[in-house]
Design a protein with these regions (language model features):
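Intrinsically disordered, low-complexity linkers and terminal tails enriched in Pro/Gly
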Residues: 37, 76-77
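Residue-level signature of transmembrane alpha-helix interfaces in integral membrane proteins
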Residues: 30, 75-76
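Negatively charged, low-complexity tracts enriched in Asp/Glu with abundant Ser/Thr
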Residues: 1-26
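Short aromatic-glycine-(Arg/Gly/Cys) micro-motifs in beta-strand/loop hairpins
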Residues: 25-52, 70
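A short, polar/proline- and glycine-enriched secondary-structure boundary/capping micro-motif
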Residues: 53-57
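A short, charged, amphipathic alpha-helix used as a generic interaction element across diverse proteins
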Residues: 4, 58-74
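Intrinsically disordered, low-complexity segments enriched in small/polar residues
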Residues: 16-18, 42-43, 66
Length: 77
């Protein structure tokens, strides 16, 4: 999975765009974000300017799958 297919899957599942940031641009506060930093993929939640949750992955695929699973699980609650 890559960022593009992640976006398609999130839209297909009905996850609202305000719940995530896939570009690293624009608003990222109070949403789950994914970014490539220093050759690694980071998935984090930013709250009031502080990363309250941060997972590091070696591949885009692993990061995207984790983010998808996390957003889908949050929606089911």
């Amino acid at each position: 999975m890559n960022i593009r297919s992640l976006k398609q899957e999130l839209e297909k599942y009905g996850i609202p765009a305000y719940a995530y940031n896939l570009t690293g641009h624009g608003r990222n506060d109070e949403r789950l974000c994914i970014e490539k930093e220093h050759g690694e993929w980071c998935v984090y939640y930013l709250e009031r300017g502080t990363k309250t949750f941060n997972k590091i992955f070696d591949s885009e695929d692993a990061a995207c799958r984790f983010m998808y699973d996390r957003l889908v699980a949050d929606r089911k609650r």
